[in-house]
Amino acid sequence: MSYIDAFYKRDEDKVRVVERDSKGQRKFVDYDARYTFYYPDSRGKHRSIFGEQLQKVQCSTFKQFIKEQKIRSNKKLYEQDINPVFRCLEENYLGKETPKLNVVFFDIEVDFDPQRGYSTTDDPFMPITAITCYLSWSDQLVTLAVPPKTLNMSGAKMATERFENVMLFEKEADMLDAFLTLIDDADILSGWNSEGYDIPYTVGRIQKTLSSDDTRRLCFWGEKPKRRTF
């Protein structure tokens, strides 16, 4: 089993991992977090890279982990800063094959207001009018679009009928809902400047037209997207 991503849930002392099996099916697995550090002790059974004898301390909860470190605050500690995610991956996935990831490359088109100008990710006041996605696992290019105000639905269908995989919608909300369904099995969502514009703008429009909870559909484990600063 190959891992795709992992997430440390400190308040639950769990490491959550997303896997793909040999058939390409995605699975979610929870592991107990392991908290480990070492300290100098002449009776220790472990050695540092410098040859110093070390004693191993392993805890099952973060609270206990902090307590054990405080007890030995007068000693030099080793590996107390290693993320539990990395320990989990080392113990369970070392040597496993790299998975074939399901990747979506996407690009959005946004309406323009002659009075207010272009909208930004901080204030996404204009609707998304089209989304084009490339799905790596099916080798498909799919376009979802809301016809412009100057074109009715029948006219839009005539204009796009010669193109494959074009889906037309009356409302932006319906288009965004279909987009979330379309990318449900994606492991990676990417595109040109997507972190700086397309992803945060899409998140903003989902919040405005659907709901804040619907943004969870973009992430593993039902987490909400977190804005990155550059």
Regions found by a protein language model. Give the residues of each.
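The two-metal-ion catalytic cores of nucleic-acid processing enzymes
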Residues: 1-230
